[in-house]
């Protein structure tokens, strides 16, 4: 018998979706490969009632709560493909096995594409960061370097300036007069010299902390192979969804970072709940048609 829903991704969005569905007494399988996007950060911040708690602890507590319901199932494995079949969807695993679900919720997140800069990888999530809302309070108060990559660099630097002495590494010729004036009002320093490497003994960093709005790429490619419509954002390509987290493909829902240009734990859990409610309603409609 197929699951009522298969959730690919067992972090905040996926667990939130699963919790709603198992509370509706629906059979749910959560698939997770154990590699959450925030695994490089020591703590999660800005999460109501969990501010400063390690992200893996938040996820572990959520997983235990979901697992307490008898209709919940988990599989720690890598999903490699998802296809539509007559009764719903078939999900393939790396070992060649398959499982089936009447609805599919994609919550596997995205991967940060780091700048090609020596020293970034070993500092990522500690002193080389991507989200001022997540880490700005802890690293603020001193100089904060911002890599001037992409069209969103100027806006990003103006936001980062709230937490410290922002230094934007960018060719001044790329700035319009309005942008230059706005950065000056925000007291952002323009540094034309390109950053060649990060120095210091990792994960520490000599001088300024580094913030970069690293763009993202979809993990797994499930949405595109299923024919879901995608949309381009300054942060990268994401799955296009409506207000109910429904993709362009019937029966396929997307929640969390893979379906929004900027994410955090709170937004991911909200998306997961919304997707679960929509998936539940679609099951009811099918069963009563």
Q: Across the structure, where does each feature detected by a protein language model lie?
A:
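Beta1-alpha1 glycine-rich phosphate/pyrophosphate-binding loop at the start
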Residues: 3-57, 142-143, 148, 154-174
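Internal hydrophobic alpha-helix adjacent to the cofactor/substrate pocket in enzyme cavities
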Residues: 18, 22-26, 166-172, 267-289
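Active-site glycine-rich loop that binds ribose-phosphate moieties when present
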Residues: 126-133, 143-156, 176-177, 191
């Amino acid at each position: 018998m197929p699951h009522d829903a298969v959730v690919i991704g067992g972090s905040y969005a996926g667990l939130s979706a699963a919790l709603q569905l198992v509370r509706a007494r629906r059979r749910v399988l959560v698939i997770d490969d154990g590699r959450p996007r925030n695994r490089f950060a020591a703590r999660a911040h800005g999460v109501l009632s969990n501010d400063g708690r390690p992200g893996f602890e938040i996820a572990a507590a959520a997983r235990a709560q979901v697992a307490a319901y008898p209709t919940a199932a988990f599989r720690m494995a890598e999903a490699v493909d998802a296809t539509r079949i007559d009764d719903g969807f078939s999900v393939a695993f790396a070992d060649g096995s398959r499982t089936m679900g009447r609805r599919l919720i994609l919550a596997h997140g995205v991967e940060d594409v780091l700048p090609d800069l020596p020293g970034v990888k070993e500092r990522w999530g500690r002193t080389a960061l991507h989200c001022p809302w997540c880490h700005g309070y802890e690293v603020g108060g001193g100089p904060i370097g911002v890599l001037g990559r992409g069209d969103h660099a100027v806006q990003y630097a103006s936001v980062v300036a709230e937490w410290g002495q922002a230094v934007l590494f960018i060719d001044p010729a790329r700035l319009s007069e309005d942008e230059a004036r706005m950065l000056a009002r925000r007291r952002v320093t323009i540094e034309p010299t390109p950053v060649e490497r990060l120095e210091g003994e990792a994960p520490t960093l000599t001088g300024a902390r580094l913030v970069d709005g690293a763009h993202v790429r979809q993990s797994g490619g499930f949405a595109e192979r299923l024919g879901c419509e995608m949309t381009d954002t300054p942060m990268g390509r994401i799955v296009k969804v409506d207000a109910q987290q429904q993709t362009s493909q019937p029966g396929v829902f997307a929640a969390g970072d893979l379906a929004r240009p900027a994410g955090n734990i709170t937004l991911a859990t909200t998306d997961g709940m919304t997707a679960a409610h929509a998936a539940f309603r679609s099951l009811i409609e099918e069963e009563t048609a």
